[in-house]
Amino acid sequence: MSSLSLTSEKFKKNYTSSFKLITRVKPFKDSLEYNLEVTNEGMEYLNQLDSNLIGIISIIGPEKSEKSFLSNLILGDIAAFDSSKPSTDIYMWGQPIAQGENTDLLVLDTEGLYKPINSKTNFDKQIFILSCLTSSVMIYNTNDTIQDCILKFTSLAKESLSCIKKIEGKDLTSTDLPLVYFV
């Protein structure tokens, strides 16, 4: 991990911590469903990126599976994400990690999946789809056994990918999808 270098000189605003990149918004007052929206701060941040190549690592998994802790380890244990309380929405570390002259790496810490309240909505699918379509690498972090983890992941992936197929009107190929690691 010592080869990572944080590149704070790139930005007008000094991002020295994680911030909410994507938040959930109710489309109307009494809705059980939520839409995901990029926050104003997130949009400002993304507009400042000037790398030719950006790699994105998304950490997904069940609630209370230590996704924030794993995100901090990937960043070199700098306590970028608050792992003392459950994350809501999607957070991103405020500095891209330089991986070469024109390549940066971004780390996303997502809200936990499989919450009882989310069983009545499509929120888990939205988190999965967003992670799937934007990431170079998706890490599924879990406290379950790998067998249970793969069963849950496969079920969510099947539902989510069928939603993508409906929207895109075509099957996704392996080049359209991120690498997936189970931790």
Task: Describe these PLM feature segments.
Residues 1-183:
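N-terminal switch/interaction subdomains of large nucleotide-dependent motors and GTPases
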